[in-house]
């Protein structure tokens, strides 16, 4: 069995001149030749840097946010505490920051934000397009965690001609399985709240990204078997694993 490679490389400072702590990073080349940099914090919180713009996804937790570059956009998938934390948003956002969030989270901003529903599209700044994708559970006994009626969001970001699917908290429902033209996928892999390893494999085989980053994976009730996930996708998709428990 091929040993699991836990990528810890590319530890570098996120941003220049900010004296920010080092967090794991990874870099990819977009279709237009530009560079996309991912910075991984933990669980569902990560950042994307592209052409000098900084995008934060579900930023929460005890990190040195005040030392990070200010956000050009913050995307919030839903209102659960491990995805949305107003104190963190306030540390990252200034008056020029675009807040893009689901309708439940929007209530905390008194709707002074871009409220997204599944199917909605936002263009917070030149060079970034965000499409909202439904995120919900379908397994018996698990639907209350992320009900379809709440209209939580995943997002498909387009940067430099490259599509990045951030699924949010969801299982392998038909809306997820029907995503097309995805280059890079972030899927949650922890039960009982999101996908099992088998569900994540099914989604990757259906949407066929070039690169898959498992995130939001389990240390809760069931520890995610990341090694089994990587093995199941050998020859199907490149999988890069970062510490995103």
Per-region residue spans from a language model:
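Positively charged n-region of N-terminal signal peptides that target proteins for export
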Residues: 1-4
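C-terminal motif of bacterial Sec signal peptides marking the signal peptidase cleavage site
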Residues: 13-15
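Core dinuclear metal-dependent hydrolase active-site scaffold
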Residues: 19-69, 115-180, 243-245
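Active-site metal-binding motif and surrounding structural segment of the metallo-beta-lactamase
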Residues: 61-105, 180-186, 208
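Active-site environment of divalent metal-dependent phosphoester hydrolases
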Residues: 63-65, 80-84, 106-109, 120-123, ...
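A short acidic, amphipathic alpha-helical/loop segment
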Residues: 87-92, 108, 175-178, 199-203, ...
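Binuclear metal-ion centers of metallo-dependent hydrolases, dominated by the metallo-beta-lactamase
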Residues: 111-126, 201, 205-245
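Metallo-beta-lactamase
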Residues: 156-207, 215-221
């Amino acid at each position: 069995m091929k040993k699991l490679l836990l990528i810890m490389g590319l530890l570098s400072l996120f941003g220049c001149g900010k004296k920010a702590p080092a967090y794991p990073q990874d870099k990819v080349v977009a279709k237009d030749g530009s560079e996309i940099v991912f910075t991984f914090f933990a669980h569902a919180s990560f950042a994307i840097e592209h052409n000098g713009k900084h995008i934060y996804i579900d930023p929460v937790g005890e990190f040195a946010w005040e030392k990070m570059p200010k956000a050009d956009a913050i995307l919030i998938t839903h209102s659960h505490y491990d995805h949305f934390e107003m104190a963190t948003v306030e540390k990252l956002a200034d008056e020029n920051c675009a807040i893009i969030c689901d309708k439940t989270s929007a209530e905390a901003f008194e709707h002074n934000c871009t409220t997204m529903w599944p199917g909605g599209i936002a263009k917070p700044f030149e060079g970034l397009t965000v499409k909202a994708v439904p995120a919900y559970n379908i397994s018996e006994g698990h639907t209350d965690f992320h009900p379809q009626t709440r209209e939580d969001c995943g997002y498909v970001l387009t940067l430099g001609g490259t599509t990045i699917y951030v699924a949010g908290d969801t299982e392998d429902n038909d809306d997820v399985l029907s995503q097309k033209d995805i280059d890079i996928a972030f899927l949650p892999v922890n039960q009982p709240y999101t996908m099992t390893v088998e569900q994540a494999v099914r989604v990757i085989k259906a949407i066929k990204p070039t690169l898959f980053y498992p995130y939001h994976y389990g240390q809760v009730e069931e520890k995610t078997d990341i090694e089994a996930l990587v093995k199941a996708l050998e020859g199907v998709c490149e999988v890069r694993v970062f510490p995103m428990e």
